[in-house]
Amino acid sequence: MLKGVVINKGITPATDLAPSEILTEENCVVILDEKNKKIYLWRGRSAGISDKFKAARLAHQLNWKLFGGAALVIQRKDVIKKQLNTYPKIDAEISKSVIRSILG
């Protein structure tokens, strides 16, 4: 089960969206795969600096908070697209309370 959020001038749940819909150069995306202990960190080339910072902070803090730093944080765009294209959609959002505790 994948959980995710899109960060683009705010934080939006990625629930029921296909990875191809959200992995754009304008967005930053954090997708959590708890079963496989992977966190996908997508930072679009045209995304704002603030959004890139928030996405990176969220991904790395989720790693420590949920996995004690043991999860694999994947940032290579080609790897992200290849691995996530096997999933039809994002199943759920990352809890707002967890995001709030990390980003404030």
Give the ranges of each region predicted by the language model.
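Long, low-complexity regulatory segments enriched in Ser/Thr/Pro/Gly and acidic residues
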Residues: M1-G104
